[in-house]
Amino acid sequence: GFGD
C-alpha cells in the first residue's frame, strides 16, 4: 500500500 501507499504509506504502509
Curated annotation (Swiss-Prot):
Q: Which residues carry this modification: D-phenylalanine?
A: F2
Compartments, as annotated in UniProt: Secreted
Q: Which GO terms describe its molecular function?
A: hormone activity
Do the record's keywords include Secreted? yes
* Keywords attached to this entry: D-amino acid, Hormone, Secreted
Domain of life, per UniProt, equals: Eukaryota
Explain the post-translational modification. Answer: Ocp-2 has L-Phe instead of D-Phe.
A single GO CC term for this protein reads: extracellular region
Q: Explain the purpose of this protein.
A: Cardioactive; has both positive chronotropic and inotropic effects on the heart. Ocp-2 is a 1000 time less active than Ocp-1.
Q: Report the protein name in the record.
A: Cardioactive peptide Ocp-1/Ocp-2
Give the organism the record lists. Callistoctopus minor
